[in-house]
Amino acid sequence: MFGALTENSTVPEWEEFLEQIRTETVQSAWITAGYPTPETSWCDEESAAIFDNMNCLVVQDLFRSPLSKRATWCLPAAGFAERNGTWVNCGHRAQTFEQAIRPPAGVWPEGRVFWNLLGRQGLYDPESIRETIAKNSVGFAALSGDIPSLGVDLRLQQFAGT
């Protein structure tokens, strides 16, 4: 949810984001997922109903969900092995990764979609995106330069930088 910031400039938790939608603080959203469970969705019907009155909802996911049924636009998502770039996991560890396989024809990873929407020239370059984020966000400053193979714990880097 890069770009969906709270009043104190932090990224909101999912429940806080849903509350922003309930109060119409947020009226448009691009939700990307990629959860490999077609039998059960990551977003239940009750949570998805909160998005009913949005002006614009883009959902990019591997599988249909209660949320994708409400989308203004539905885009196919690329799986983890079909992307390259930097991930930050739930433990606040940032790691770079390389694409292992090509996505199906017509499927673009989120980064490439954003790259094109921003009017960037040439091929999608996730390293330059990481460098730009590192330069412009104190919380991600540790992502500048080479990243060790085991990644960087962003919490430790923030603590060390204060």
Q: Where are each of the predicted segments found?
A:
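Non-catalytic alpha/beta scaffold blocks inside enzyme catalytic domains
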Residues: 1-148
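Acidic, Ser/Thr-rich low-complexity intrinsically disordered segments
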Residues: 146-162
